[in-house]
Design a protein with these regions (language model features):
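Iron-sulfur cluster-binding electron-transfer modules in prokaryotic oxidoreductases
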Residues: 1-221
Length: 221
């Protein structure tokens, strides 16, 4: 199943656009393409970026941050981590990367979130049943995390966040926020949580202001 001919055309059109970007920005030495989505990462691997941007590599944003030494200070914060089916983290076991970025108080939360790409839209009957099991896993994960934090002498958080690295999973996890009223659940991206803690609550408008003031290259293709 799948629209393979249409997918191939989209891939070809995108590669043409990337070649135009490379020609327009030929005064820049582009060595790294940073990706934040596992599905996009897998697809872009077939684009042959090394032929478009000579010597270029594709790297996941979490592994790139770790490579650059950007991590959160250990202030006792604890998180649940939902590992997506299509993880963008390729260099080592994802939990090692997540704990290196966020600190030791991170627990992996198992089971599918129920979104599964478009499953939550195309088959809500199945997705709802999957979400029931995931909700049980979240509740038990919350209890386990709070117990671990207490044992470590870390301050108890009023809210427990569940973080992920997948746009589709984040959409799925957001569906639990209205169902879980025990201080859980707030779902977000790992990198957004890191930006909030390292740069402050106003990190996004500050970034947009800097980008609009000349912090990005604008390319007409």
């Amino acid at each position: 199943a799948g629209q393979f001919e249409r997918a191939d055309k989209i891939t070809t059109d995108n590669r043409v656009l990337f070649h135009r970007v490379a020609n327009t920005l030929n005064y820049l030495d582009i060595r790294t393409v940073v990706v934040s989505c596992g599905t996009c990462y897998d697809q872009l691997q077939g684009y042959r970026f090394e032929d478009i941007f000579p010597g270029c590599r594709i790297v996941d944003i979490h592994e790139y941050l770790l490579e650059k030494g950007v991590t959160l200070p250990d202030q006792g914060a604890g998180y649940l981590y939902h590992d997506p089916c299509h993880s963008p983290m390729k260099l080592q076991e994802p939990m090692k990367t997540v704990q290196a970025l966020l600190g030791p108080h991170v627990l992996k939360n198992d089971r599918c979130c129920g979104e599964s790409g478009t499953l939550g839209v195309t088959r809500p009957d199945i997705a709802t049943q999957v979400r029931f099991r995931k909700e049980e896993s979240i509740r038990s994960g919350e209890a386990a995390l709070r117990a671990r934090m207490a044992q470590a002498g870390a301050p108890a958080a009023a809210d427990v966040k569940i973080l992920t690295s997948c746009p589709s999973c984040l959409q799925g996890l957001k569906r639990y926020e209205d169902d879980l009223s025990s201080g859980l659940l707030e779902a977000d991206y790992i990198v957004v949580e890191m930006a909030r803690r390292l740069l402050g609550e106003d990190w996004l408008p500050a970034y947009v202001a800097r980008a609009n003031a000349g912090g990005i290259e604008r390319v007409l293709v």
